[in-house]
Amino acid sequence: MKEIRSDMRELNGLVMGKMKERGLQCSSHPPSDWATGTGANFSGDVSFFERGPNEPIPTTFGDVLETDDGTGFGILSGDDLMLRLSTELEVTHCIFLIGDSDGIMTSPPGEKDSKLIPHFGPDTIISGKHDSDIDVTGGIGLKIDRSLEIAKIVEEVWIIDGRKPDRVVDLLASGETIGTKILSG
């Protein structure tokens, strides 16, 4: 547990370093410092993520947390954090960054005929299955479920390729980018 927590803080430090290089001031808020439990109903007050225009950008990430369910600890997914932050705070955009494709694909990214789905709604169908041996946090399925919930409240919900940071800039500047826009239905 300590090793995973340490690794997550190290990764967050790298992300914050890149943001600082771009002139952005950030503050780090590891969930293990302020939350308990897992899933969308984890315990923890997210109101301190509200900020004024001249205050540092608060950052957080998926983490190993203590639980009250008898297991002792569990993984709080960043997707569940996104759900709480997006639905409890005044949010204009919710952007999920993934690392293996341009956005949601018709089938797993490595498959021959897999194509980007530019708009994804509650009735959109994809193929594939989640491998919980590789990803214990829910994979793309949880990301899709949470993004659909968020889209009921937040108009601009996207899943895009995090390996291409200019796409975030394009989205914020023009309202469009290569990726998948999540529709409320």
Residue map of PLM features:
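C-terminal catalytic "cap/lid" subdomain
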Residues: 1-185
